[in-house]
Amino acid sequence: MSRFFSRGYHYDTASSSEDEELLTSSEEELMSSSEEEVVSDDSFFNDSESESAESDDDSDGKPYGPDWFKKPQFRKGGAPGGSGASRFLKGNADSSDESDDEGKKVVKSARDKLLDELNNTYNKIDAAEMTQDWTTILSEFESATKLLVKAQQQNMGTPNVFVRVVAQVEDLVAETSQAEIKNKIVAKAYNTVKQRVRKIARENEELLAKFRQHPEAFEKDSTVEFGQARDFDASDLTLMGRKVADRSAIVSSPSDFFSALRIVIDSRGKKGTDIQAQIKTMEELVSISKSPYESIIAYLNLIPIRFDACANLAYQPLEQWKASHNNVTSLLELLEANIESYHVTELAPRNEFIEEEPQPNENGVRMILGSVFTFVERLDDEFNKSLLNTDPHSSDYLDRLRDEQSVYNLILRSQLYLEKVLPEDTASKHLCRSFVRRLDHIYYKTSKLVDIVERAAWASVPANSSSKYITYSDDPDYNFKLVNTLCTVVSSEQEMLKRRATLYQIYYYALNNQFSKAKEMLVQSNVRNSINSQDPTIQILFNRVVVQLGLAAFKLCLVEDCHQILNEVSTASHLRDIMGQQSLQRVSNNISSNGTVTPTEMLCLPFHQHINLDLIDAVFMTCSLLIEIPHMAAFYSGIKVKRIPYSQKSIRRALEHYEKSSFQGPPETLRDHVIHAAKAMQRGNWAQCINYLRSISTWTLLGDKMEKVLEQLAERIQIESLKTYIFTYKRFYTKLSVQKLSELFSLPTEQVISVIQTLENTINIKGSLNEAKEMLIFDKGDEITKLEEVAIKLTKETKYQSERLNNVSQRQ
């Protein structure tokens, strides 16, 4: 309607530049009431029940303004006896008299609603007092405390009615004796109310004292400012995003410090809370704390809030992480300096009143409930998350990796602290988490790197620090003793962590060239029997152990053992996944499709812990070459040998694909180099075979063991090439000179004789050495020559093609 008249009528007025929409009288009342609330905001905490009267002067005078053409009942302000458009609304259609009887609609502010709820709570407690219904009293008193927190979050201070509720419940508790209560449930509710009201009364001691002196002053539904109760001055200290007190006022008494701390604690995790403001408040409280107890409590609350700030992020930002690291370090320094007076431990009883220090035990030590090592664990987790979310090929990854030493230092430092504060009979059980974290950081490192990490970590702890389990020393075997000690303690105390500790120990031994011991430990552990039912993280660790064990066998040139160990793992279709070396995005997709509950970060390993997949392929294919090429030569020469199962990555399958290819160029990839080495071995050209394998750049990942491994590998290639030569060409010879074979393969005569004798005993080569062991004499058998072999093959192919053509002609 307004849109229609705005087009049909034009007016010019200085009081308005825009067209006004048609308002009902009820809407005008709401607007006028809201305007009055804004005007009277100076007395925000004073209850005001007076409402402004509606002025009808404009309706009595001459119409003017943009709505002069409207009927009186629709004009702004309305007619004296009408309600404007509201009379056409539902419920207002009977008569104007009925509308007047209904009265005006009251719109209450959030403050008024909260005060009404507190008044209702007061009345319900008053009614429950008559029947001694302590269950209802407890429920309503808890509701009142929640409403107080809500009021303080809205900058309303402490309502007077809340003070009356506390005084009411306090008097009721004092008048009631627990002996009078027979019902167990009611008695339990009574005890809970007694504890809660004592705590609340202590926090509002000054207000209660004023209430006792002048109860009539608290009859009005007003609120007491947070600063007025403690004579605070306005300053820049921010609490929950609002100014509450200056620094000098807060430190004026311990109750002020804990009152501010209590507000932060009560509002933590609630919707609409400004976490950054909480962090700033806690930082201020840490800086102004006067006693060690205040500092400890402040740190125990500041550090979790820092972690809460990044709960929805992929990982904690570097600046926040370093701030958390500094806070944990400062907390440990504080606890170490006051270890004779305060102990922070998970075994301490819960203290309901943080304002009061816990009572000292028989040793004069006050036990504070908390977990320092939980903070260290969270720091370590955030560190790993940041590595997983950083490009591993960038300099940022290397810069971030430098912080690993500081994390390990904190792990060791927290372990030493826990050893001092935990009871001796249960210390080992609670220290298992710390030991596993230490193993997480050292099990994949060589002995030299572990020595560097340990030396730096022990240098960072206070002087004269020692562990009752193992302390750093210059003993060359210290690193192995360290891993053995940590794994032994964990395995004996925690059954859930036993498998993980055992696998850590096996991995460390395999990595540091202790293949025999590592293999023996893996067989005795029986982990393989139940690995399919284990946690995905244990399965990933087991696969890594198996691969590392195979690499350890290869370094010792134990080709058969290496091939047997790596055969199942290396031929898996998703090797990267089962090794925990896939990207976070891929893991997230797999988890969403499979419904796995394991956290994404636990299924991935940082890049510096990865085992190079090209190295695994190179080792497996090289072992396959040394085993399968002589076996294939023996099989094709008519010797009955045991069939070897082969996989997609075996050299036999690779050669089949290679021979089918139309173009065979020079080697480029790792696979090409191994295939060309295999072809050279088939021809008996061992030198060329070694050159092809040496040209693989992946061998540099073997470190300082590379040259030694390649030398052993070259010797093994010479021996296997000798076997292949004998199997392939024995059909063309009646006898072979041992001396000639020695010169051809650059092997000592004794070694050539040993190889031939081994073939005689294990494989029926239909030949033997003469008495002087100078000649290998072959018995004439039913072997076919190469020409006969080609003729037979051609005959079979011709027959097959002929049958195929006959079938085609018959169909036509």
Swiss-Prot record:
Functional summary from the UniProt entry: Component of the eukaryotic translation initiation factor 3 (eIF-3) complex, which is involved in protein synthesis of a specialized repertoire of mRNAs and, together with other initiation factors, stimulates binding of mRNA and methionyl-tRNAi to the 40S ribosome. The eIF-3 complex specifically targets and initiates translation of a subset of mRNAs involved in cell proliferation.
A matching Pfam family: eIF-3c_N
Keyword Cytoplasm found: yes
GO MF terms, alphabetically ordered: RNA binding; translation initiation factor activity; translation initiation factor binding
Biased composition (Acidic residues): 17-40, 48-59
Signal sequence residues: none
Taxonomic lineage from the root: Eukaryota, Fungi, Dikarya, Ascomycota, Saccharomycotina
Subcellular location: Cytoplasm
Family recorded in the similarity comment: Belongs to the eIF-3 subunit C family.
The name this protein goes by in its record: Eukaryotic translation initiation factor 3 subunit C
Subunit structure: Component of the eukaryotic translation initiation factor 3 (eIF-3) complex.
GO terms for biological process, alphabetical: formation of cytoplasmic translation initiation complex; translational initiation
Domain called PCI: residue spans: 607-783
GO CC list: cytoplasmic stress granule; eukaryotic 43S preinitiation complex; eukaryotic 48S preinitiation complex; eukaryotic translation initiation factor 3 complex; eukaryotic translation initiation factor 3 complex, eIF3e; eukaryotic translation initiation factor 3 complex, eIF3m; multi-eIF complex
Keywords carried by this UniProt record: Cytoplasm, Initiation factor, Protein biosynthesis
Predominant localisation class: cytoplasm
SMART domains: PINT
Stretches the record annotates as Disordered: 1-105
